Amino acid sequence: LYCLKKKTLVGGFFMALAVGTKLLPLLLIPFFFRYLGLRNFLKFGLSILGFSVLLWLPFWKGEMLENYTQTIQLWFTTFEFNGSLYNIVRAIGYEVKGYNIIRKLGKVTPFITIGLVLLFSLLNSNRKPQQIFKSMLLLLSCYFFMATTVHPLYLINLIFLGILTGYAFPIVWSLVVFWSYSAYGVG
């Protein structure tokens, strides 16, 4: 929210904390480019980078980057829980290929996500807070629709953005997501 007040240093600090907690906020950074303008966006980006380095420095070891990369790959190519479109693609994969195609699909999904980030940050105006929130909601919705793993807790971001933008579908999604647990029921 500090970015919306164009306080780029403080906004960068809080974004670095968010990224240090979960990588998902990295996807949202480009949405501030048009709103902040080039100069302020560079300040914002450099403050995120600087504060992130300070946050990660105590944990940095030679093999950390490799281990972190492997963890992200594992997330995209191995885990599966409550994935919307993924389940449809997986069923088609079983029908066409005869096996679970998560490893192949997981290698493509990050590129689709990057493409969507560029699409939503460059094609949408994002010059007003309401437009930024709408772009964030659309991107995160697409991301979660494509994801192989979506825990119900992840929908909190969508609910928050849905409230800010007036969209109700995140609330509906959060109400029906618990039906997915029926697939894991006993008997």
Which positions does each model-derived feature cover?
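Membrane-interface transmembrane helices that cradle and orient dolichyl/undecaprenyl
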Residues: 1-10
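Transmembrane helices and adjacent periplasmic/lumenal helix-loop junctions
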Residues: 9-34, 54, 145-154, 168
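Perimembrane helix-loop-helix junctions
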Residues: 27-50
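Membrane-interfacial loop-to-transmembrane alpha-helix junctions, especially the N-terminal start
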Residues: 44, 128-136, 166-174
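Aromatic/glycine/proline-enriched transmembrane-helix motif characteristic
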Residues: 74-149
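Aromatic-enriched
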Residues: 168-187
